[in-house]
Curated annotation (Swiss-Prot):
It comes from Lawsonia intracellularis (strain PHE/MN1-00). One of its GO terms (cellular component) is cytoplasm. Its cofactor is Mg(2+). One of its GO terms (molecular function) is DNA binding. This is Crossover junction endodeoxyribonuclease RuvC.
Amino acid sequence: MISVIGIDPGSRNTGWGIVHEVSGVLHLVCCGVIQPSCNGSFAERLAHIFQEISSIIMKYKPVEASVEQVFTAQNPLTALKLGQARGAAVVACANQGLLIKDYEATTIKKTLVGHGRATKEQVSFMVGRSLGVKPDWPIDTSDALATAICHLTIRRFENRTARVAKTL
């Protein structure tokens, strides 16, 4: 069994999801969205993201993390804030000793849907199908779960490829 936390970072909404894989079958453990108060300073929001991710990791004990990479925003300040929120989440994972993998949004979409330009709705649908549940969660949560599923899928493929290579 392997347990992964997927994270869709954001300074206002950080989606997260824990997925277990047992014998190639994916199971949803828990998921949600971290929403720091907009009343506090930006540094307080980052601290909140760090603390919440740390608490989630301590509670659910994932051993690996998959984090969506920052897209290139048109506004440099937005990109900077998104990068800082992502950094808070990554440091929380690293602080707990998790192996961390980064994935571009197009890679996540291609892995789940089959093409890198999939809509949020298509990704959410495939997340639900992959986990055997009806997707009734926010988009940030869906994106985080998609990140975890992408990681588990790529990991499974790499493990199989390595086993085949050893036999050659």
